[in-house]
UniProtKB/Swiss-Prot annotation:
Enzyme class: transferase
Protein name listed in UniProt: Aspartate/glutamate leucyltransferase
Transmembrane spans: none
Molecular function per GO: arginyl-tRNA--protein transferase activity; leucyl-tRNA--protein transferase activity
Organism: Pseudomonas paraeruginosa (strain DSM 24068 / PA7) (Pseudomonas aeruginosa (strain PA7))
Length: 235
């Protein structure tokens, strides 16, 4: 923490919260001039920071503490019955690791996902510039995991591979393949990949109890939440 204490951070002005409409949000960002090396990113992930594009951030709201960083310690994970069904349903998918890049196949999948799954969110309408700025970053730890069925692209899990685990940045998938539960499968695959790499945890971002889009994360057990500056197991 001594090294982190020397870093500069900047807070945004209060703005409407994307997840809880009745709340005002403030976000704390690492100084954009600070080089984002892998070890620094890993250290900040241990204290609840996330990456979006070229920025590392965490919530810093004055009157709300609903956003709580969550991670899955993979050593203790065992899929439940529903999760085993999802794994079986998608066992034939091929996963390919790629460097982040822009192409029309990726963008078409992203566009259809946003239009059909998140038309009520602040990422709608999608655009090529939005896709590139948000996800296509030339960073040494970032990769696209493609999920393909007989060559057809079904999903991409944008993932940061860190010394302490995998950080699940964003996953988008074919909205016409709802029966496959591809978002859940991507998390289950990332858990298995983290364990295969001998790493500690999958960092899932923020859990928000009263937000349907963000409270699904506690379906994965065991799970740890970053509360009062330490990771605690949710019981």
């Amino acid at each position: 923490m001594t090294e982190l204490a020397r870093l500069k951070f900047y807070a945004t002005q209060p703005h409407p919260c994307s997840y809880l409409p009745e709340e005002q949000a403030t976000t704390l960002f690492l100084d954009p001039s600070q080089p984002m090396d892998t070890q620094l990113y890993a250290s900040l992930s241990e204290v609840g920071f996330r990456r979006s594009g070229d920025h590392l951030y965490r919530p810093h709201c004055q009157h709300c503490t609903a956003c709580i960083a969550a991670r899955i310690p993979v050593a203790g994970f065992s899929p439940n019955r529903q999760q085993r069904r999802i794994l079986k349903r998608n066992a034939e998918l091929q996963v390919i690791r790629k460097r982040p890049s822009f192409n029309e196949e990726y963008y078409d999948l992203y566009r259809r996902y946003i239009e059909q799954r998140h038309a009520d969110g602040d990422m709608y309408p999608p655009s090529r510039d939005q896709f590139a700025t948000f996800l296509v970053r030339d960073l040494p730890f970032c990769c696209f995991f493609e999920f393909r069925l007989h060559g057809r692209l079904l999903a991409i899990a944008v993932t940061d591979v860190l010394p302490n685990g995998l950080s699940a940045v964003y996953t988008f998938y074919d909205p016409d393949e709802e029966q496959r539960s591809l978002g859940r499968y991507a998390i289950l695959w990332q858990i298995a990949e983290t364990e295969r790499l001998g790493l500690q945890a999958v960092y899932l971002g923020y859990w928000i109890k009263n937000c349907r889009k963000m409270n699904y994360k506690t379906q994965y057990r065991p799970i740890e939440l970053f509360v009062n500056q330490r990771w605690v197991a949710l019981t």
